[in-house]
A protein has these predicted regions:
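Short, surface-exposed loop/turn motifs that are enriched in glycine and acidic residues
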Residues: 256, 273-276
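Conserved mixed alpha/beta core segments that line enzyme active sites in large multi-domain catalysts
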Residues: 288
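Acidic (Asp/Glu) and glycine-rich low-complexity loops/linkers
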Residues: 2-75, 79-160, 166-178, 184-196, ...
């Protein structure tokens, strides 16, 4: 007679609950231990300083000189400072910075940053390498602070992720690229290109050409621009100075322009507002928007051929011009000798004009 083995008895329910409870306690203890280690060694949570990391470490980088014509810098959250030198060599210096509960942990954090420097031909490559971090960690990450003094003949390219870039009296030409890092340039000269995703850009007293591309970062620029090109999605743009040619394109960002002198200017927005103050461009000035408003405050005397058109928006004109518009949706008129062409087009945005002494 064939025997059939009886199924084994399942583990009792109290035993299963006990095993699960013990496993949960072990996982909680591991998580708390990791949390306390990160908290004590770094001292911040989600970027909020709890003043627990009372020590930091700065490992200095000895100055090095290179005879090159181009510099390439790449990093993550690192800080890059470019300045001018009257010499013929690029000078590299800086430091690695780490943070922790005590000096030993801060030094260990700084050692997680490696600065790789290599000259290949006439190009200097500087790459900041970071040791991989845990997916979820707390505290301030270590970073490198690089300082490069550049001769005017050298070109540069700096690419960062969340790190900031600063340019001080740089006479060289080049490109700065960041994702969320900010860019500040002061007293610069030459051809400068800045590209960010969300990082803000501030340019003070630039002399030369400037090209800016950003998604949501704001731009504030002052200077004498031979060729100005700005492209944003929803970042606001504030400009002041002199322009040979200027072209600004944005979707929802507002554009504010103060002009002392210009030859040609074109501003395009989708629903961003345009505010213009100052002297009209000598040759051609064009402003086009769909739903954004256009506000013009122009210096007297007005010497221009004006062509204002709006589909459903309203026009606000000085009292002395009101009778010259047969159509409240458009105005075509020549004032003075008509040396400048001023063209403004909107779909639903309003157009307003004011003259000032």
């Amino acid at each position: 007679m064939k025997q059939t083995d009886l199924p084994s008895q399942p583990e009792s329910l109290p035993g299963q609950l006990l095993r699960r409870r013990l496993l949960g306690i072990v996982l909680i203890l591991i998580g708390l231990s990791w949390f306390l280690f990160e908290l004590l060694s770094r001292g911040t949570i989600a970027g909020i300083n709890l003043n627990l990391a009372s020590a930091d470490s700065a490992e200095s980088i000895s100055p090095q000189r290179f005879a090159v014509s181009r510099v390439e810098v790449t990093g993550i959250n690192d800080q890059v400072i470019l300045s001018r030198t009257t010499g013929e060599e690029v000078i590299l210096s800086g430091e690695r910075r780490g943070f922790g509960w005590a000096a030993q942990s801060a030094t260990a954090a700084a050692m997680q940053v490696t600065i790789e420097v290599e000259q290949r031909g006439d190009t200097l490559y500087v790459h900041v390498r970071h040791q991989p971090q845990m997916m979820w960690h707390f505290g301030r990450d270590p970073y490198a602070r690089l300082e490069l003094a550049l001769p005017s003949e050298v070109t540069f390219n700096v690419a960062l992720m969340s790190g900031d870039a600063t340019l001080q009296q740089v006479m060289a030409s080049g490109t700065i690229t960041t994702i969320s890092g900010d860019v500040i340039a002061s007293d610069t000269n030459g051809q400068l290109t800045i590209e960010t995703t969300s990082g803000d850009i501030e340019v003070r007293n630039h002399d030369g050409s400037l090209r800016v591309v950003t998604v949501s970062g704001d731009l504030e620029a002052v200077g004498q621009f031979t060729d100005l090109q700005v492209e944003t999605t929803d970042g606001d743009v504030v400009l002041r100075g002199k322009y040979t040619t200027a072209r600004i394109i944005t979707i929802s960002g507002d554009v504010t322009i103060a002009v002392d002198d210009a030859d040609q200017m074109r501003v395009e927005t989708t629903n961003g507002n345009i505010r213009f103050t100052g002297q009209l461009a000598r040759e051609m000035q064009e402003m086009v928007t769909i739903s954004g408003d256009v506000e013009l405050t122009i210096n007297k005397p007005l010497d221009a051929q004006i062509n204002f058109t709006t589909v459903s928006g309203r026009m606000r004109l000085p009292a002395q011009f009101a009778h010259q518009s047969a159509n409240t949706r458009s105005l075509t008129q020549t004032f003075g000798q008509g040396r400048t062409m001023l063209k403004v087009e909107t779909t639903s945005g309003d157009i307003s004009l004011r003259l000032r002494e």
